[in-house]
Amino acid sequence: MRVNITLACTECGERNYISKKNKRNNPDRVEFKKYCPRDKKSTLHRETK
């Protein structure tokens, strides 16, 4: 079962990305290192509710 998730920057809190994940394979919150346009650098983005 795939669900839509929103990824927010851990430094500024801005929600920059929308993605999908499989809840069966990844039951915990996912984290990706992605580019944040507000900070102008790659930062850690964490799944939000």
Curated annotation (Swiss-Prot):
<feature type="compositionally biased region" description="Basic and acidic residues">
    <location>
        <begin position="25"/>
        <end position="49"/>
    </location>
</feature>
<feature type="region of interest" description="Disordered">
    <location>
        <begin position="20"/>
        <end position="49"/>
    </location>
</feature>
<protein>
    <recommendedName>
        <fullName>Large ribosomal subunit protein bL33A</fullName>
    </recommendedName>
</protein>
<keyword id="KW-0689">Ribosomal protein</keyword>
<dbReference type="GO" id="GO:0006412">
    <property type="term" value="P:translation"/>
</dbReference>
<dbReference type="GO" id="GO:1990904">
    <property type="term" value="C:ribonucleoprotein complex"/>
</dbReference>
<dbReference type="GO" id="GO:0005840">
    <property type="term" value="C:ribosome"/>
</dbReference>
<dbReference type="InterPro" id="IPR018264">
    <property type="entry name" value="Ribosomal_bL33_CS"/>
</dbReference>
<dbReference type="Pfam" id="PF00471">
    <property type="entry name" value="Ribosomal_L33"/>
</dbReference>
<dbReference type="InterPro" id="IPR038584">
    <property type="entry name" value="Ribosomal_bL33_sf"/>
</dbReference>
<dbReference type="GO" id="GO:0005737">
    <property type="term" value="C:cytoplasm"/>
</dbReference>
<keyword id="KW-0687">Ribonucleoprotein</keyword>
<dbReference type="InterPro" id="IPR011332">
    <property type="entry name" value="Ribosomal_zn-bd"/>
</dbReference>
<comment type="similarity">
    <text>Belongs to the bacterial ribosomal protein bL33 family.</text>
</comment>
<dbReference type="InterPro" id="IPR001705">
    <property type="entry name" value="Ribosomal_bL33"/>
</dbReference>
<dbReference type="GO" id="GO:0003735">
    <property type="term" value="F:structural constituent of ribosome"/>
</dbReference>
<comment type="subunit">
    <text>Part of the 50S ribosomal subunit. Interacts with VmlR.</text>
</comment>
